[in-house]
Amino acid sequence: MTTIRCVLFAVLLFAYCALLIKARSIDAEAEKTWQEEETKTVAEKSPLKKRGCSDAFPVVCRSPSVKAACYNPNHRSHAFITDVCKHTCHLC
């Protein structure tokens, strides 16, 4: 009886782990798909698209914290952010 319980427990544990791994991969795929769709949607609606900009970085450049760094030359990330935004045709 104990052996049957151990085998049953092992099978259930294996099945649980397999389902958990599958669920994580489905979540990762869904997240990736959502990010790709969001990037495409934002890029298509963006006025940057009209100027030939199709990179995903303009989404990042439009965030409030990045804009604050762009407008503040004393910010520690100002040079990096300005450089990245210029390469994507986005003017902070």
UniProtKB/Swiss-Prot annotation:
Instruction: Name it.
Output: Neuropeptide ShK-like2
Residue ranges the record marks as coiled coil: none
Statement: the UniProt record of this protein carries the keyword Disulfide bond: yes
Q: Which key words are in the record? A: Cleavage on pair of basic residues, Disulfide bond, Neuropeptide, Signal
Query: Any idea what job this protein has?
Result: In vivo, this neuropeptide induces contraction paralysis followed by death (within 2 hours) on 4 zebrafish larvae on the 15 tested. Also induces body contraction in Nematostella 11-dpf polyps.
Record flagged with keyword Disulfide bond: yes
Origin organism is: Nematostella vectensis (Starlet sea anemone)
Give start-end of the signal peptide. Answer: 1-23
Proregion residues are 24-51
Please provide the Gene Ontology terms (biological process) for this protein: neuropeptide signaling pathway
Disulfide pairs?
A: 53-92, 61-85, 70-89
